[in-house]
């Protein structure tokens, strides 16, 4: 009887719109961990899991058609999946606040040297299960940042190519150990198009560039990683190829969006465990972004998590950016497929420590600074 009621409420009235709903579902669920919970939220549910409607008794017991219909987050065949609340608290459709639309606000300032084409990646993969080796050439803006110390040149951080002359990385990657001064530009170099740091026969054909200018945020604080962003200017113009091209900056898209619960990608050559060995090959992982308040509470004994920070990771740990991933990109695709740089790997408690997400510099909070300094 329950099954029949559910189908009469949801499935049959929606058959005429199943194509539209399925398309929206794919857009929402395109980049997910199939082995992890599919997190979701809507105006009825602050935090939920996208699951088969028959498995969500909390919503079924409400006997509210509009609530069920507007909670749809996907389909299993023709059976709807709904955003099922993690707690028993869920408001009815008559109590829910009205849906709002946001008018796109014009950006205050846009760098004149942004590329016309950006964010085009080279993989058909739409999901990552845990951390894994990235396909060769999948992330063509990924940058290895080298530092020469004591005559030895080694990868210390990651970065993201954003124009044909500029790489964005973390401020803590470019300052001295005291965090007081920027290291000279000639100790830095970058490598584009790399896959395996220690192999020359992996078909990646990387290219090295010297760095002529290093600009870090003038109000960077090493103790709290506040304003953890820097721009490297390369000595020559980068010729874009299928394996080397820039990621988009969120000037016209994502700038004012609430990114909580979204699942961006992070890439790097960092260690796969705290104090463990570095990875020779580029690795990728996909992590959910935390609600700001949850992140603030997680770190409230350590520092004040303001709006310039963004947190991502699983509450039970297990997957995270790690040592050596610093400065690397947090990347989110838009509906048209282009990837945007929304975060910079900054810091965390060890690596994937339960209860403590990784912390990232929120790029949308620094777009005016980038426009001013990326010349």
UniProtKB/Swiss-Prot annotation:
<feature type="binding site">
    <location>
        <position position="199"/>
    </location>
    <ligand>
        <name>Ca(2+)</name>
    </ligand>
</feature>
<dbReference type="GO" id="GO:0004252">
    <property type="term" value="F:serine-type endopeptidase activity"/>
</dbReference>
<keyword id="KW-0479">Metal-binding</keyword>
<feature type="glycosylation site" description="N-linked (GlcNAc...) asparagine">
    <location>
        <position position="235"/>
    </location>
</feature>
<keyword id="KW-0378">Hydrolase</keyword>
<dbReference type="InterPro" id="IPR001254">
    <property type="entry name" value="Trypsin_dom"/>
</dbReference>
<feature type="glycosylation site" description="N-linked (GlcNAc...) asparagine">
    <location>
        <position position="304"/>
    </location>
</feature>
<feature type="glycosylation site" description="N-linked (GlcNAc...) asparagine">
    <location>
        <position position="122"/>
    </location>
</feature>
<dbReference type="GO" id="GO:0008236">
    <property type="term" value="F:serine-type peptidase activity"/>
</dbReference>
<keyword id="KW-0645">Protease</keyword>
<feature type="active site" description="Charge relay system">
    <location>
        <position position="172"/>
    </location>
</feature>
<comment type="subunit">
    <text>In the active form, heterodimer of a light chain and a heavy chain; disulfide-linked. Forms a covalent heterodimer with intracellular coagulation inhibitor 2/LICI-2.</text>
</comment>
<keyword id="KW-0873">Pyrrolidone carboxylic acid</keyword>
<feature type="signal peptide">
    <location>
        <begin position="1"/>
        <end position="21"/>
    </location>
</feature>
<feature type="binding site">
    <location>
        <position position="196"/>
    </location>
    <ligand>
        <name>Ca(2+)</name>
    </ligand>
</feature>
<feature type="active site" description="Charge relay system">
    <location>
        <position position="228"/>
    </location>
</feature>
<feature type="propeptide">
    <location>
        <begin position="22"/>
        <end position="27"/>
    </location>
</feature>
<dbReference type="InterPro" id="IPR022700">
    <property type="entry name" value="CLIP"/>
</dbReference>
<dbReference type="InterPro" id="IPR009003">
    <property type="entry name" value="Peptidase_S1_PA"/>
</dbReference>
<keyword id="KW-0732">Signal</keyword>
<dbReference type="GO" id="GO:0030133">
    <property type="term" value="C:transport vesicle"/>
</dbReference>
<comment type="function">
    <text>This enzyme is closely associated with an endotoxin-sensitive hemolymph coagulation system in limulus. Its active form catalyzes the conversion of coagulogen to insoluble coagulin gel.</text>
</comment>
<dbReference type="InterPro" id="IPR043504">
    <property type="entry name" value="Peptidase_S1_PA_chymotrypsin"/>
</dbReference>
<feature type="disulfide bond">
    <location>
        <begin position="322"/>
        <end position="351"/>
    </location>
</feature>
<dbReference type="InterPro" id="IPR001314">
    <property type="entry name" value="Peptidase_S1A"/>
</dbReference>
<dbReference type="GO" id="GO:0042381">
    <property type="term" value="P:hemolymph coagulation"/>
</dbReference>
<feature type="modified residue" description="Pyrrolidone carboxylic acid">
    <location>
        <position position="30"/>
    </location>
</feature>
<dbReference type="GO" id="GO:0016485">
    <property type="term" value="P:protein processing"/>
</dbReference>
<feature type="disulfide bond">
    <location>
        <begin position="56"/>
        <end position="84"/>
    </location>
</feature>
<feature type="domain" description="Clip">
    <location>
        <begin position="39"/>
        <end position="84"/>
    </location>
</feature>
<comment type="similarity">
    <text>Belongs to the peptidase S1 family. CLIP subfamily.</text>
</comment>
<protein>
    <recommendedName>
        <fullName>Proclotting enzyme</fullName>
        <ecNumber>3.4.21.86</ecNumber>
    </recommendedName>
</protein>
<keyword id="KW-1015">Disulfide bond</keyword>
<dbReference type="InterPro" id="IPR038565">
    <property type="entry name" value="CLIP_sf"/>
</dbReference>
<keyword id="KW-0865">Zymogen</keyword>
<feature type="disulfide bond" description="Interchain (between light and heavy chains)">
    <location>
        <begin position="118"/>
        <end position="248"/>
    </location>
</feature>
<feature type="disulfide bond">
    <location>
        <begin position="40"/>
        <end position="83"/>
    </location>
</feature>
<dbReference type="InterPro" id="IPR033116">
    <property type="entry name" value="TRYPSIN_SER"/>
</dbReference>
<feature type="active site" description="Charge relay system">
    <location>
        <position position="326"/>
    </location>
</feature>
<feature type="site" description="Cleavage">
    <location>
        <begin position="127"/>
        <end position="128"/>
    </location>
</feature>
<keyword id="KW-0106">Calcium</keyword>
<feature type="disulfide bond">
    <location>
        <begin position="50"/>
        <end position="73"/>
    </location>
</feature>
């Amino acid at each position: 009887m329950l099954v029949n009621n559910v189908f009469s409420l949801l499935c049959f009235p929606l058959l005429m719109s199943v194509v539209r709903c399925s398309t929206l579902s794919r857009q929402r669920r395109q980049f997910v961990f199939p082995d992890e919970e599919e997190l979701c939220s809507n105006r009825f549910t602050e935090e939920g899991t996208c699951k088969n409607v028959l498995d969500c008794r909390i919503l079924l017991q409400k006997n509210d058609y509009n609530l069920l219909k507007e909670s749809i987050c996907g389909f299993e065949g023709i059976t709807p999946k709904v955003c099922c609340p993690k707690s028993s608290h869920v408001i009815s459709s008559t109590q829910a606040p009205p849906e709002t639309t946001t008018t796109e606000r014009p950006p205050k300032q846009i760098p004149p040297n942004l590329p016309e084409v950006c964010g085009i990646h080279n993989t058909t993969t739409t999901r990552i299960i845990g951390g894994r080796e990235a396909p060769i050439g999948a992330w063509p803006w990924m940058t290895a940042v080298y530092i020469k110390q004591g005559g030895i040149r080694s990868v210390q951080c990651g970065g993201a190519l954003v124009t044909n002359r500029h790489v964005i990385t973390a401020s803590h990657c470019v300052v001295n150990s005291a965090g007081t001064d920027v290291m000279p530009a000639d100790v830095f170099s970058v490598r584009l198009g790399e896959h395996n740091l220690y192999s020359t026969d992996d078909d990646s054909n990387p290219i090295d560039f010297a760095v002529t200018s290093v600009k870090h945020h003038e109000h960077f604080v090493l103790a709290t990683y506040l304003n953890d962003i820097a721009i490297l200017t390369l000595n020559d113009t980068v010729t874009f190829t299928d394996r080397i091209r820039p990621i988009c900056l969120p000037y016209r898209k994502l700038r004012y969006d609430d990114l909580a619960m979204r699942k961006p990608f992070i890439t790097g050559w960092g260690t796969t465990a705290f104090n463990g060995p570095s990875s020779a090959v580029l690795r990728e992982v996909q992590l959910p972004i935390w609600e700001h308040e949850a992140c603030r509470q997680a770190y409230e004994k350590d520092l004040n998590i303001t709006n310039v920070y963004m947190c991502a990771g699983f509450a039970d740990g297990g997957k995270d950016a790690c040592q050596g991933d610093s400065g690397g990109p947090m990347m989110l695709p838009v509906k048209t497929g282009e990837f945007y740089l929304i975060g910079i790997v900054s810091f965390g408690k060890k690596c994937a420590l339960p209860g403590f997400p990784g912390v990232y510099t929120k790029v949308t909070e620094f777009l005016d600074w980038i426009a001013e300094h990326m010349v």
